[in-house]
């Protein structure tokens, strides 16, 4: 048997971290079993679905490295398949037309609430006669198609994560709406609803394993009944834990950063984000190993090691993982990743003309980066011809003899300064002024950087020298 799994997002918003984590688990499972990973776009919600969201979802999956083998398939292009399935269920007496109005359904819910009962449809139109149906249609009522769910049946499956799961038919809310008739009343059933469309797609696409969030468990019970009613083999199911916020509630848009776009803009690398998402609910065989590629994770991935409990989102852990990936990159590799952040902040560096200097800058700040978006903050002392002196630096420059030290250093500077020459200037100045080297270095840092703390001073000096900014800054210090 070839393993076939799918990720089936709805294009009603940008790619969400929860959907992306589900995609990661499906991708890993497919690759581990040398199977197929299928992309299906569930776009039957015509009011909320947008083509730009479809593009965002596909771009997000590609950015994360989650390449799919088949698709994308769109549900709006498969309506005839759903209508055929609905007709089959009607012909078999497993579904029926329900003509209840919204007002009648609301009154039903209110009465149930008053009696402290869970809201459910009471199946009142399950056994309408043809004459009764005709009367409703003559009155202009629009029908929905309901699938019959017997209250006294049990739905049982062996979940690959949660083990044995049992649902009672009586807990599923009564006979389930699977489609609405069209506005003009034609017998084309209008728009099929989620549970019916999903089952038909999974049957046609020969999906062997459905891996999704635990919030779909009730849907799974309903869908198993539909598989059986359509005479199809029921796939294996695995329900992964939800991603939780710091308060232990399901992560939602109210928590702020939830879309993959958000994480990308914040400066997270796709490899790091995928690495972290893999650990959100899954424990690798070697629990001490936390940094790995998708391909390495696929070799050892199994659903048995997915946790049942919710996975709390940990920003500190994500930042640490991201920093590990960043610290492995060379300056040359960092430049194209950091350049957009410098440019967005108003620094007009060019990838070609400033390339060598930017590589040196990226090499200098690379070990300090946690996110790509840290680029400006970590390099801010080196980005302009003049320094912005804080009070601590100004106080250092006002000490007796310091400006004379700066003048001597300024006089000794040459273009294309090397590390050895720079060290020699410091040594010569220290001896000439008969002071401790620490005073010279501290004063030089104050003059060049505008602050007494920051990146490596000698490397910073060489970078500033390449643009002639060491001279302009030392002159600024002398005149301060």
Swiss-Prot record:
Annotated motif 'HIGH' region, positions: 9-19
Record motif 'KMSKS' region, residues: 250-254
Quaternary assembly: Monomer.
EC number(s) given by UniProt: 6.1.1.17
Record organism: Microcystis aeruginosa (strain NIES-843 / IAM M-2473)
Keyword Nucleotide-binding: yes
Keywords: Aminoacyl-tRNA synthetase, ATP-binding, Cytoplasm, Ligase, Nucleotide-binding, Protein biosynthesis
Name this protein carries in UniProt: Glutamate--tRNA ligase
Main location: cytoplasm
PANTHER family: GLUTAMATE--TRNA LIGASE, GLUTAMATE--TRNA LIGASE, MITOCHONDRIAL-RELATED
EC class of the enzyme, as a word: ligase
Listed GO MF terms: ATP binding; glutamate-tRNA ligase activity; tRNA binding; zinc ion binding
Alphabetized CDD domains for the sequence: GluRS_core
Localization of this protein: Cytoplasm
Residues annotated for ATP binding in this entry: 253
NCBIfam families (alphabetical): gltX_bact
GO biological process: glutamyl-tRNA aminoacylation
PROSITE patterns documented for this protein: AA_TRNA_LIGASE_I
GO CC annotation, single: cytosol
Catalysed reactions, as listed in the record: tRNA(Glu) + L-glutamate + ATP = L-glutamyl-tRNA(Glu) + AMP + diphosphate
Keyword 4Fe-4S in record: no
Entry's family note: Belongs to the class-I aminoacyl-tRNA synthetase family. Glutamate--tRNA ligase type 1 subfamily.
Role summary: Catalyzes the attachment of glutamate to tRNA(Glu) in a two-step reaction: glutamate is first activated by ATP to form Glu-AMP and then transferred to the acceptor end of tRNA(Glu).
InterPro entries: aa-tRNA-synth_I_cd-bd, aa-tRNA-synth_I_codon-bd_sub2, aa-tRNA-synth_I_CS, aa_tRNA-synth_I_cd-bd_sf, Glu-tRNA-ligase_bac/mito, Glu-tRNA-synth_I_codon-bd_sub1, Glu/Gln-tRNA-synth, Glu/Gln-tRNA-synth_Ib_cat-dom
